[in-house]
């Protein structure tokens, strides 16, 4: 495949951007926006900042993908033993110099997209944006090698995007929003779990102490299942105000998640786990969709 792709061509950059990962970036924003809409209605829903939040999430995800591609290549992590999808720099689809320029462009672009959000969310949005950029780099260069990748996913694919999106719309935070952000981070972390589960032997070889390497195969399998289960159980918070659909619908996701878990346990190792990665990404998007639909249905029924 690498021989058919011209270096630095549009197709090469499309592959480097990893568009399939954008669903994971969209889910936290979807959840934050749906909760804001439920609590404020159409009259108070701000369309422009909603679109900016979504666009910022997309560009930051692409930026993170570029950073990951470049630094893993420089550290020699993407060698001939790699089990996951091939990476642009390692395959020669994109030059390392070109990737550095792309990282700079996407970082600046994310900043320009996020800057207007100060108008709606206040200057604290600057801190949010800076943290997103800083930890985007720290994840690949240091923290993912020290078993902190899962914590960062909980923060930057859960707490930060869900709460920031909601806060921009409503200028406050609620218990339901905070718990929903935690649930979202748990669901998205299943993707990192299966990724590191697949790469556990290679990571051990390269000295990467991911959570999977630290706790072992069996515990990692159980944690993968437990993350999805815990996320759905957190939805109990919606029963008390009578938001039954928001609680019930995500259990459809849990059924899919449980089936994917059984497949993962059967496959155990090798490139065949890439299909579990794809199924997990699908499940994450379905969770976000079900949660959003549940929130909107509750708005209709409660009114």
PLM segments and residue spans:
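Small-residue-rich segments of transmembrane alpha-helices in multi-pass membrane proteins
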Residues: 26-32, 152-166, 184, 213-217, ...
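Acidic (Asp/Glu-rich) catalytic motifs at the cytosolic membrane interface
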Residues: 59-83, 190-212
């Amino acid at each position: 495949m690498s021989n058919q792709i011209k270096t630095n061509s549009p197709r090469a950059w499309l592959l480097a951007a990893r568009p399939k990962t954008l669903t994971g970036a969209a889910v936290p924003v979807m959840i934050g926006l749906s909760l804001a809409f439920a609590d404020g209605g159409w009259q108070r829903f701000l369309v422009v900042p909603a679109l900016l939040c979504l666009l910022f999430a997309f560009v930051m995800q692409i930026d993170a993908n570029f950073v990951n591609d470049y630094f893993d290549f420089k550290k020699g992590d993407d060698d001939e033993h790699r089990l996951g999808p091939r990476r642009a720099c390692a395959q020669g689809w994109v030059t390392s110099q070109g990737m550095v320029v792309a990282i700079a462009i996407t970082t600046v672009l994310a900043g320009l997209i996020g800057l207007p959000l100060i108008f709606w969310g206040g200057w604290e949005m600057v801190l949010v944006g800076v943290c997103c950029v800083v930890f985007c780099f720290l994840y690949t260069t240091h923290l993912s090698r020290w078993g902190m990748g899962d914590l960062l996913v909980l923060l930057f694919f859960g707490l930060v995007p869900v709460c920031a999106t909601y806060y921009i719309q409503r200028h406050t935070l609620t218990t339901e929003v905070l718990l929903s952000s935690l649930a979202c981070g748990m669901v998205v972390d299943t993707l990192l779990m299966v990724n590191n589960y697949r790469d556990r032997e290679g990571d051990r070889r390269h000295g990467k102490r991911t959570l999977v390497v630290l706790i072992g195969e069996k515990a990692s399998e159980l944690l993968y299942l437990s993350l999805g289960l815990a996320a759905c159980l957190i939805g109990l918070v919606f029963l008390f105000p009578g938001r039954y659909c928001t609680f019930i619908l995500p259990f459809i996701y849990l059924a899919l998640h449980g089936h994917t878990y059984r497949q993962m346990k059967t496959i155990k190792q090798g490139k065949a786990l890439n299909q579990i990665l794809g199924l997990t990404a699908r499940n994450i998007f379905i969770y976000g969709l079900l949660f959003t639909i549940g929130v909107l249905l509750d708005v209709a029924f409660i009114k």
